[in-house]
Design a protein with these regions (language model features):
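Periplasmic alpha-helical coiled-coil/stalk elements that build and connect Gram-negative outer-membrane
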Residues: 3, 120-300, 406
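Acidic, glycine-rich loop-and-beta core segments that form the ion-binding/anion-interacting portion
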Residues: 288, 293-342, 356
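Short, charged, amphipathic alpha-helical segments
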Residues: 106, 235-243, 376, 442-450
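Bacterial N-terminal signal peptides that target proteins for export
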Residues: 1-9, 17
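Bacterial Sec-pathway N-terminal export signals of envelope proteins
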Residues: 19-70, 87, 91-93, 97-100, ...
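Sec/SRP-type N-terminal targeting helices
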Residues: 42-46, 59, 93-123, 307-308, ...
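Short segments within alpha-helical structural elements
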Residues: 152, 192-193, 198-200, 250-272, ...
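Small/polar, glycine/serine/threonine/aspartate-rich low-complexity segments that form flexible
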Residues: 67-101, 177-227, 282-290, 334-366, ...
Length: 479
């Protein structure tokens, strides 16, 4: 029983470690799954496998020819009567033709392999880019929800000030926040009742008594006017924060819809159900570029697309050599075997003995136009592949420089907005504390809160852009 328990515990530990490793390195896991199951990459690999099958075809001799002949009436020969003949002939191309043909097929298979690597690298870049987009959307939802909590806190503070007429202390407003947590709409009954009661109280307090009441002091009218203005300002502040809340709630809803779309886009690269869950890391490591700039620039020719055109150029060079050698004669070697029947009365020593005749044949390639056209075709295709290689390399250099610029820009923005977000967060906390004690303008609190939200979004965008730029550099250099 103890052994069974040990095995169960061991299995659970292995499973937990497996899932933890997947959680820590989920992107690597998704890249592996994409390489295994993406139909586009599998199609390119199948094409490469099919191209490999052409190599033994190209390096093989043509099939030998077998000829059978039967004489309906035996032919009288000196050594007897010939009744049948059998001949075998094998044609051999000119020296080096098969080697050139094999080289062409091998280089074309290599080009297919480089095409497969290109598709795989492009898939990896798309998976990384889509993964980073998912991460950005998830983080933006988290940031928006945290800022929504801040706005709800500001709403409670504004509602408390509106109820107390702006005269309550911070402790008093803290107690009022608990009782007014449900007052989130300017059209709610509680707020209307409080505003109506406040207005009626102010109105009754400002009306002079007609029966023996003391006379109104000269400053009471100004005080009532300032209290009315303060009440209006507090109500406007409450409406402002509720407008911001509604805008942010709408933005969160939009981000949630975007998250569904991002998952569909990501899952299609893995060829799995589009609604499958995707797990992302809690944070993206800000990985530096792996090599220095000069080494990266020198590695651009290692891009599989460049190597593919190089292989095509070499294949067409071998094809040109093959076309040249195909214009030379083909040599045939064979054997003719004649069946001889004995003839009565023939005293020859060869009477009835079969005859064997070695044969040699030679083709005459006198129609030269087709061989010339084959050479011209191979030469033009070789030049086209060389020009395509140059064009791809030029585009890689431009795209690499653009990716490097994007990386440097994103790296600067990460440092900038990380610091700016910290400063803005401290400013928001200080302004909220100051507003609670009646020392800060509510508009300034909202403005700084919006700036904090903007900095946090930009910081996430910068981190995603930086990692996407690194993935782009890796894709361009073919690593």
């Amino acid at each position: 029983m103890r052994q069974i328990i040990k095995y169960i515990v061991l299995i659970i530990m292995v499973v937990v470690i497996h899932y933890e490793s997947n959680g820590q390195d989920s992107l690597s896991y998704y890249l592996e799954q994409a390489a295994l199951y993406n139909p586009g990459v599998k199609s390119r690999y199948i094409e490469y496998s099919a191209a490999l099958e052409k190599v033994p075809q190209a390096s093989s001799l043509t099939d030998p020819e077998l000829q059978l002949g039967y004489l309906l009436k035996p032919m009288m020969l000196l050594g007897g009567n010939q009744v049948a003949s059998v001949s075998v002939m094998q044609m051999f191309p000119w020296f080096g033709t098969l080697k050139a043909s094999k080289d062409e097929a091998s280089k074309m298979a290599l080009a297919k392999f480089e095409s497969f690597l290109t598709a795989k690298n492009e898939l990896f870049y798309n998976v990384k880019s889509s993964y980073y987009k998912l991460y950005r959307t998830i983080k933006e939802i988290e940031i928006a929800e945290k800022n929504l909590e801040i706005l709800h806190t500001l709403e409670k503070l504004a509602l408390t000030k509106f109820r107390t007429g702006g005269t309550g202390s911070s402790q008093g407003m803290g107690g009022q926040m608990q009782s007014g947590t449900n007052m989130s709409s300017p059209g709610s009954t509680g707020m209307n009742n409080s505003s109506m009661s406040g207005q009626s109280n102010m109105g009754s307090g400002s009306m002079p008594s007609s029966q023996g009441s003391p006379a109104m002091s000269p400053g009471s009218g100004a005080m009532n006017g300032s209290m009315g203005a303060t009440g209006k300002d507090d109500m406007v502040n409450l409406l402002r924060v509720q407008i911001e809340i509604h805008d942010l709630e709408n933005r969160i809803a939009l981000l949630r819809d975007q998250l569904v779309t991002d998952k569909v886009s990501f899952n299609r690269f893995l060829n799995r159900p589009l609604s499958a869950d995707v797990f992302t890391a809690d944070s993206l490591s800000q990985t530096p570029i792996p090599l220095n700039i000069h080494e990266l620039t020198d590695s651009l020719p290692n891009n599989p697309m460049v190597k593919m055109y190089q292989a095509e150029s070499e294949a067409n060079r071998a094809k040109y050599d093959m076309a040249t050698k195909m214009g030379y004669p083909m040599l045939g070697v064979g054997l003719n075997y004649m069946l001889i029947q004995k003839r009565d009365g023939n005293t020859s020593m060869m009477n009835g003995k079969d005859m064997k005749m070695p044969m040699v044949s030679l083709s005459l390639p006198i129609y030269r136009k087709k061989y010339k056209a084959m050479r011209n075709e191979a030469g033009l295709l070789r030049d086209a592949a060389s020009q395509s290689e140059i064009d791809v390399l030029n585009n890689l250099q431009v795209n690499f420089q653009q990716a490097l610029q994007n990386f440097n820009d994103a790296d600067r923005r990460v440092k900038l907005y990380t610091g700016q977000a910290l400063l803005a967060d401290k400013s928001v906390q200080l302004l909220i504390t100051s507003y609670s004690s009646g020392g800060a303008d509510f508009v300034e609190v909202l403005r700084m809160q919006q700036q904090l939200l903007d900095y946090q979004f930009k910081q996430v965008d910068a981190v995603v852009d930086k990692n996407t730029s690194i993935a782009r550099v890796v894709y361009l250099t073919g690593n």
